[in-house]
Amino acid sequence: HKADLNAQFIEKKTGLIVRPTVGINYSKNDYRMKNVQMRDESGDNFIVGNPKRFHDGYFSLLAQVEAGFTNKTWADAFFVSASYSKTDKELQTGSVQSKVYGMAERNSDSWNISARYQKYNFILKNMQLNASLSHTWDHSLTVDTAYRKYYWDGGYIVSQRNEIMGKEPSMRHYKRPLTIMRTNLDYRLNAHHTLNLNYHLSRTGNDRYDDLDTSFEPSK
């Protein structure tokens, strides 16, 4: 299931442009697997069957608003935006389909602010400036707390280890802020020659910690 809303509003007096965007995506992902090992109805014997995936749901949300101006004396285009995105993902398998999960999940939240600017004939005639700046706060959480071993029939047995890591329960956080700046200055000397200057800056962090796993060493 997917739904998107895009709109644009223009304030006539000032020329202010506002563009809201909302998007939602949901999928249960309960399609059938082919020829996988699973338990029979008694739970005592293994058979080869075609069971449905039972823990593979996906949900995402995006909300953004952009506001700015075009065709002004001081800018051909100038926009600022703010957005929020969220993803909830159930985890069904590991690196191989024989390793089945039934409770592990990964969730993320992300906030972003950005600005972009474009100007033709910037300072000099035939000089064009394009510049953008954005910063993102990204937080991801992997929940792996169940002492269970799952099978493709949806049943499980109690285990001594968690599902993904095979260790003690874990609620692993990843915080990765990201700043990106891009600047492009293009100057047309004549019909055959141009001078182009580009600058790119990228800075990211990697803050990791765990609420439950005492053996995990946090890092920044």
Model-derived features with residue positions:
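A short beta-strand motif that forms part of the nucleic acid-binding face
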Residues: 7, 24, 201
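Short, low-complexity, polybasic intrinsically disordered segments
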Residues: 99-101, 108-109
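Face-selective signature of the C-terminal outer-membrane beta-barrel domain
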Residues: 64-87, 106-220
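Flexible, solvent-exposed loop segments that connect beta-strands
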Residues: 34-50, 97-99, 160-163, 209-219
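Feature captures outer-membrane beta-barrel proteins of Gram-negative bacteria and organelles
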Residues: 3-13, 113-116, 219-220
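Periplasmic-side early beta-strands and strand-to-turn transitions of outer-membrane beta-barrels
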Residues: 1-4, 13-96
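Low-complexity, flexible helical/coil segments
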Residues: 22-32, 53-58, 101-104, 114-120, ...
